[in-house]
Amino acid sequence: MPYRAPLDDYNFLFDHVVGLDKVRQTDRFEDASDDLTRAILTEAGKLCEEVMAPLQRAGDMTPSYLENGVVRTADGYANGFKAIAEGGWIGMSANPEFGGMGLPTTVTTAVNEMMSAACLSLQLAPLMSQGQIEALEHHASDAIKDIYLPKLISGEWTGTMNLTEPQAGSDVGALNSKAEENGDGTYRVSGQKIYISWGDNDFANNICHLVLARLPGAPAGTKGISLFLVPKYLPDENGEAGVANSLKVVSLEHKMGLHGSPTCVMQYDDATGWLVGPEGGGMAAMFTMMNNARLGVGCQGIGAGEGAYQHALAYALDRKQGRTPVEGGSGTIVDHADVRRMLLSMKADLFASRAIALSCAVAIDMGTATGEAEWKARAAFLTPISKAFGTDVGIEVSNTALQVHGGMGVIEETGAAQYSRDVRVTAIYEGTNGIQAMDLVARKMMDGGEVANGLIDEIEAHAEAARDRFPSMVDDVWQACESLREATDWLTSETDLNQRFAGAVPYLRAFARILGGHMHLAAALADSTGGKREKLARFYIKRLMPEYVGLLAHAQSGADDLYAITVEELAS
């Protein structure tokens, strides 16, 4: 079925749930009026429905390939990217000084989710550029900004990030790539990088790589890593793409999904690069890009889930099988209780994860606009939750959508299986979801749980405002908050990080589950008619949110039983 952008959900969330009004009240974003954001979402929806969605199957059926050292993309991808670039969608939140729109990240987040639902493999290209733009805005010299930012924002050039090496995956500090100073302000960069999304393409005039490498004499580990900007073509005196640099695409990976997106093995052989940020400051600079990408990847999961849900719903409304168990039913499988359960679970989880991601974006915008540490800390706390829960939901919804299709779900022609194949990697790249959870219970709780407990307090206060209308749901949310607070206290009092890490994933999931209940309750409160928002909230809070009980028990179980079984016993 054709993709339809869920504009009603975005506008409802902006107006009633995530607090975009606070962002609009700041001096920085005062021009982001309701009329403007609605118009932007409408135009983005048209782009996704009419231009990007038709490319979804094309990229899957005709994967990118390498020809004479150049990546060739599926038919229509070049025109699709051109439409994205010409519409200004790459630079939505970028600095207007360099050609960006200067819009709130919250609006960009909604648009990125729509693009991911329409064609995830193509959306990866502008997402990588957006992350690089933000990293350069924060860390690059003025000379680099003046040359590269206008080109990246316009889409004339595209950007990538190069972290991973064969021996250095999650342990980035183990990388071997090196850089040596040339004496003229440039550096010679050498090494091999793997898993580079959109490491090359056939529609941009230049591809700009952000590469992590180590300078001579630099300390071991992440403290010795620096960041370099290494373009495919060196800019000439006019700032245009000039002579070829000493780098190449060695090969493309043959992947489970995302066939339209080239995943490259990159080789740098004394390639010319420029230092971004200070020597040894590579991880700090790269994390700017990665945090941008982590929220974006969470939205990729949600977007893929939305596309899968729409496919499943259309199939359920059309497929007739068995006798309808409800009077006045449609006669299709949507009448069957288990199918209805699956559809409601998908819809409720998508709403919850979407609301969490947009709330994270609001915190980012408020931190940017006000400079207040409280907002920045909240954004940092919500980022791993948004990434992990958004991608988990995307995977689960895509799998459930396939189940709704029955046997037709595994027949490629229906398109249902593609969502499952495409979305699976989102729980792995930009930091696995396990690493997101470890980050949450370690770095993000170095404040003794201040941000976590502040969020719990806020959920309880907002729930109390709904008690007169929804006493039963409010009681459920309150009980969940008390259990979450207890688990938070246990984690923050545990000094052995490995004991925390053993329960990190279930803790993150439980926090997201309860945040989702908070978002649904806020939606129900804003739905004065007792309509679909209230009904969906009741379904989520009564049927899905209770998962937190087992999760929090797991989160507080420690690590001892994990190591009670020996490696030999695991293999026996």
Region locations from a protein language model:
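Glycine-rich cofactor-pocket loops
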Residues: R28-D31, M61-A74, A285-G296, Q310-K347, ...
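A short core secondary-structure module
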Residues: T186, S190-A244
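Alpha-helix capping/hinge segments and adjacent helical runs
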Residues: R4, R188, L258, S359, ...
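C-terminal amphipathic alpha-helical interaction region
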Residues: F98, D447, E458-S572
